[in-house]
Amino acid sequence: METTNFGFVASLLFVGVPTIFLIGLFLSTQEGEKSSFYSDSGKGKLDPKR
């Protein structure tokens, strides 16, 4: 039980941490004020409408 539980927590962290990082990066690009550096390089990828 402990081995599978540890594997579950490890996989959860392995998936969750990059997801939270990407969500934070996505929100910062949505605001546009904090990340003017990312907005220019990622306009074509994240903002195809503009």
Curated annotation (Swiss-Prot):
GO biological process terms, semicolon-separated: photosynthesis, light reaction
Alphabetical list of InterPro entries matching this protein: PSII_PsbM (IPR007826), PSII_PsbM_sf (IPR037269)
Major site of localization recorded for this protein: membrane
Annotated keywords: Membrane, Photosynthesis, Photosystem II, Reaction center, Thylakoid, Transmembrane, Transmembrane helix
Localisation: Cellular thylakoid membrane
Pfam families named among the record's database cross-references: PsbM
Membrane-spanning ranges: 6-26
Subunit structure and binding partners: PSII is composed of 1 copy each of membrane proteins PsbA, PsbB, PsbC, PsbD, PsbE, PsbF, PsbH, PsbI, PsbJ, PsbK, PsbL, PsbM, PsbT, PsbX, PsbY, Psb30/Ycf12, peripheral proteins PsbO, CyanoQ (PsbQ), PsbU, PsbV and a large number of cofactors. It forms dimeric complexes.
Record's function text: One of the components of the core complex of photosystem II (PSII). PSII is a light-driven water:plastoquinone oxidoreductase that uses light energy to abstract electrons from H(2)O, generating O(2) and a proton gradient subsequently used for ATP formation. It consists of a core antenna complex that captures photons, and an electron transfer chain that converts photonic excitation into a charge separation. This subunit is found at the monomer-monomer interface.
Family: Belongs to the PsbM family.
Stated name of the protein: Photosystem II reaction center protein M
Species of provenance: Prochlorococcus marinus (strain MIT 9215)
Organism taxonomic ancestry: Bacteria, Bacillati, Cyanobacteriota, Cyanophyceae, Synechococcales
Name of the coding gene: psbM
